[in-house]
Amino acid sequence: MTGKPAIDVISFGCRLNTFEAEIMKREAAAAGLGAADAVPAVIINTCAVTGEAVRQARQAVRRARRDNPSARIIVTGCAAQTEGETFARMDEVDAVIGNDDKLKADSYRSLPDFGVSAEEKVRINDIMSVRETAGHMVDAIEGRARAIVQVQNGCDHRCTFCIIPFGRGNSRSVPMGAAVAQVRRLVDAGYREVVLSGVDMTSWGADLPGAPRLGTLVQAILRHVPDLPRLRLSSIDSIEADPALLDAIGTEMRLMPHLHLSLQAGDNMILKRMKRRHSREDAIAFCVDMRSRRPDIVYGADIIAGFPTETDAMFENSLRLVEECGLTHLHVFPFSPRKGTPAARMPQMPKAVGKERAALLRARGEAAHAAHLARLVGTRQRILVEREGLGRAEDFTLADITVGAPGEIVEAEIIGQTGERLVTRPLMAAAA
């Protein structure tokens, strides 16, 4: 025995879950879970975005029990919060902990005994009653060259397809000082790139005194942590982007030229039925405007295929959005009805139609991505080495890289492409 707590955290879904996994492991260890003289523990940190995500979590639970017959198996995350009984009924599960409690050591100190009833396994509070999100400090993100900082949690919007507000609660912001201090701490630990993350990140600040906006936070981080080479945003809602954020994207070269947009669809009627806050014209205008400010900017987007009532013509509008917005990195999901959401009660499309349309969207996205890679051939790019042989350019494109240690930034010439990656010829280690 090495004395290191035997705790394995398996995370599904978003970057926020990845960040929270580090906190959960630390808090569970502080509570004595998985100690050298105790049984090992496996924590499954679930996602609730789609039915497939829940299925994969259940599969992970069964696999964890097969691989670790004597371990304590704990299920938490968004799917645990929204449908805890689903996991509590599984014989393999020892405890189900809600999204708020999973970040507290006390939640792991008094776990239920083996073999208790499903009701006794569940430790879930009312997520809607949570009013604050602590600025949790982490010194490292295990196995990653870039660090993630949570600045916001929850969502005040109620899109008709989305279960996440019921898994994460209403929007809460990490205070600016705590967020800046966390970035400072990670840069001091050697990280060259920090990713700001949240559930609805462009709503950051609305619940804080004075209601500051996300752009103010971004500018504060860049100002107070001048030795941070790369700051990246995760997903944003373009209709909520404030003027200070737009200015920062256009002028701050340390803010990476990659935006992942929560678009969801390209047809106005479908957007209305989704209860989104933007139109297709809004999305296109935003992308055109940002590209005029920052010509090297690259867009990713979430798009749902086969939403209830989506006709062929409506779907074509989503397909055309790839070109009209200049999208490069697509996250495509066939519509998945989530119990309790308004969209689950709408007239449903056949699953085969959703899968077929998702495949068409992915193919359109892959073609756009290949064209983007081809345009980069002959340019110079700064590559953050993620692991041996692989890194990412500033626009989040994967690149083969033959030199540099994980976490090092290397300047390289792009000499070709292979699959979804750039082929590079290293020139030198880049200065911060």
Segment roles from a protein language model:
Residues 1-204, 219, 244, 255, ...:
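Proteins enriched for Cys/Gly/acidic motifs involved in redox and nucleic-acid/cofactor modification
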Residues 11, 198, 235, 263-265, ...:
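Active-site proximal loops enriched in glycine and acidic residues that flank catalytic Cys/His/Asp
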Residues 70, 111-121, 206-215, 223-227, ...:
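Short, glycine- and charge-enriched coil/turn segments that flank and shape catalytic ligand pockets
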Residues 73-77, 82-83, 188-312:
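Conserved SAM/AdoMet-binding glycine-rich loop
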Residues 103, 157, 202, 268-269, ...:
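Glycine-centered loop/turn positions within well-structured domains
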Residues 159, 196, 233, 261, ...:
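Conserved, mostly hydrophobic/aromatic
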Residues 310, 325-327:
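Contiguous mid-protein beta-loop-alpha structural module that forms a pocket-lining wall or clamp
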Residues 337, 345-432:
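Terminal RNA-binding accessory module
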